[in-house]
Structure formats: C-alpha cells, structure tokens
Amino acid sequence: MDFGLQPPEITSGEMYLGPGAGPMLAAAVAWDGLAAELQSMAASYASIVEGMASESWLGPSSAGMAAAAAPYVTWMSGTSAQAKAAADQARAAVVAYETAFAAVVPPPQIAANRSQLISLVATNIFGQNTAAIAATEAEYGEMWAQDTMAMFGYASSSATASRLTPFTAPPQTTNPSGLAGQAAATGQATALASGTNAVTTALSSAAAQFPFDIIPTLLQGLATLSTQYTQLMGQLINAIFGPTGATTYQNLFVTAANVTKFSTWANDAMSAPNLGMTEFKVFWQPPPAPEIPKSSLGAGLGLRSGLSAGLAHAASAGLGQANLVGDLSVPPSWASATPAVRLVANTLPATSLAAAPATQIPANLLGQMALGSMTGGALGAAAPAIYTGSGARARANGGTPSAEPVKLEAVIAQLQKQPDAVRHWNVDKADLDGLLDRLSKQPGIHAVHVSNGDKPKVALPDTQLGSH
C-alpha cells in the first residue's frame, strides 16, 4: 500500500480509530500460554514414557513404545519453542504500532489546519491572506509527509513481526493399518462365533434326536447278563469241585483280599519305626576306632609268630631314590656298618620254621645280616618274609638248607654282574597275595613294589630270595 497517496486525515484517523495494540497483546499472551503448556506436556510425556520403559514395562514392546513416543515428545518441544517465538513477535508488533501511533499527526491538529485554511481563503478578498494560506498549506504538507513516513516504518516493522515460522503437523505414532487390522480381526472373530454357534446348534439337534429312553433298558440287560454269568460260573465250579465249590472259591478270594488289607495296615503301622531307623542310619556316625600302636619298621620286620617284636609301621619308599651298590639298588640301612654275616642255616641246619626263634636272631631283619643269608638262599626253611601294607608277616616254604654259608659280598658281586636278572613288580595291597602266589612258581629274583595311597611300599616275593 502506498501511504504517500493517502491524505494525513485518513492515515491519522485510521491509526486513532483502529483497535490499537490490545489484540496484539492478547495474542502475545495466548502464544505464551500455548508455549508453556506444550513445554509442560512434553516434559510430563517424556517422564512417563521413561518411567514405564525403565521400571514397570520392559521388553521389546516397551522399547517399541518408547521409540514411537520419542518423535512426538520432540515435536511438542519444538512447537513450544515456536509458540514462544510467535509471542515475542506479537510483542514486537505491539512496539511497532505504538511507535507509529506516536509518530503520526493527531487528527485534531490536521482538522485545525484545515479549518484555518478555510477561514483564510474565505477572508482573502484583497489577497492579504496569501502568505498565511501558503504557510497553512506548507504545514499541511509536513503533516502529510510525517504520516507517510510513520506508516511506512510501521508497515516494515509489522511485516517483520508478523512473519512466523510455519508449524508442522504432529508425527504419526500409531500404525495406520491398525484400524483395518482390528476390523479384520473383529470380522474373523464374528465368523468364528457364527461357526461355533452352528456346530453347537447341530450338536443340540443331534442330542435331541438321540433315543435316551433305551439307556435304562441297556443297563438292565447288562445287569441281567452279569447275574446269569455269575450263576453259570457257580454251577460250573460246583459241578467240578462239589456242591460247595463255588462257596469255597468265593471265601478263598475274600480271605486273600482280607490278607492284603492286613498287609496295608502293617505297612502303615511300621512306617514310623522304619522312618526312625532310616534317619538313624543316615545321620549316625560310629565313634572313631582306636589306632593300634605299631613299632618302627626297623624293630619289627621279622616273623609275626616269633621273629617280630610287634606290628611294624607301614614302610614308605621313594621312586628312584634308593642307594646303589654298583648297579644294584639296596635299602638305606645297608649303608651303615653291619656285623659279620651269620647264617640262620648254619645255626639250625636241620630244623624247621618252629625252631627259628631259638636262633636268638634279633627281631630286626637286618640284625646279624640275616638278610644276606636270605638273599643267598641259606636260610632255607627258616622264614622268608613278605611285607603287607599294615605290617610284616612271613610264612615258610619247605626246602633243603644250604650246604654251606654264602657270603653277602659274593651275592652282591653276582647281582652287580647281572643287574637285569632282578624283575620288578608294582602292585597294590589288595593284589599283593595273589602276585606273591604267582611269583612263587616262577624262577628268578623278583622285587615287588607295593603301593598304598601316595606312598609306595616294597615287599619281597613269597619265596627264598636265592631261588625266586
């Protein structure tokens, strides 16, 4: 609009006669309220969705709900900001209007100028008012220019203030095909209900046509047939076993049934004692048995019936840690000084095992180098010893005593020349007796290694060392 073509009376009149800044202020307040409401709604919406997704509602459906609600929360926050901007622009328009209203010439001044001009023109008979008329017209022109400039400034400011950012529609947070799917499901359910009603109607019709009157007759016939069968079986048993056969047969089975009833009562009566005995067996632990004192290994490796001073403690051994005499592995006690060899066979050359204690050989197996005699076979029938896991025991095998003593040095020298002649056997306590029985029938020199738990034990074969 070209405000330069419009006289100041109209321009000023429109500014003074218009609604003023009231509507723009009301619009600014409304935009402010909308912005605050949208912001509050967005915060509440986000809080509710977050609380449901993290506490009361978990799983894939909860994640889908949160993902669908997030764009709507974003839209509300953005729209709230736009509403706040619109309120600010409305207030800017109010400021522009107030500025333009103050800049335009008030209509009373314009009316006074026009009245003065009319008066001067009416009294200008001789031209004496020509200067006054020109001054009045000049003043009017200034008013026109002032109103024109004020309106152009107001138009520019109001155009900027009224240029708002376009609002967008809220995003779609639901499935558009949900209504169609719901309608289809409703139709399917209706059809299924119709089919069910049809089936129910058909069954009701068939039930109405069924002849229920014949059921009592059928039941009565079955009862009669059962009675006739019982009578027939009774007559047959009486014909085979005599006139009281059926009664005896019936009493027999009644007695058997009563016996089973008594067994049930007995089971019920014994359930409590059985429970107590079961609990006693499960939780009762026997008191620890006293340990049998055992003498040391060196003090009791002789015969249990007289050569030993008592039960020997379990012997322990280490693999690959024995002393060596040349290539021969020997017990650790062989390294100590020993007395001269005195053979048991020389002491009692013609006696048996019962006379072995009379030789006064110490209980220690290594005392007086009896082991040397046993190694050479000179002990004969005295007492070749074997060793079990709990101690030492011996039994004698018959044989002929050696004709002459055998020196220990000669036996050791012979074993050094033939280190491979000694056969080693590994066995546990349970299989020791069986192994010794088998080795007693095999010639050669055998070394039996007995294992008991983590500590292996060594036992000599159940024969004379000189022959097996």
UniProtKB/Swiss-Prot annotation:
GO terms for biological process: response to host immune response. InterPro entries: PPE_C (IPR022171), PPE_dom (IPR000030), PPE_sf (IPR038332). Gene3D superfamilies: PPE superfamily. Residues 447-468 are annotated as: Disordered. Pfam families: PPE, PPE-SVP. Belongs to the mycobacterial PPE family. PANTHER family: GLUTAMINE-RICH PROTEIN 2. This is Uncharacterized PPE family protein PPE33. It comes from Mycobacterium tuberculosis (strain CDC 1551 / Oshkosh). The gene is PPE33.
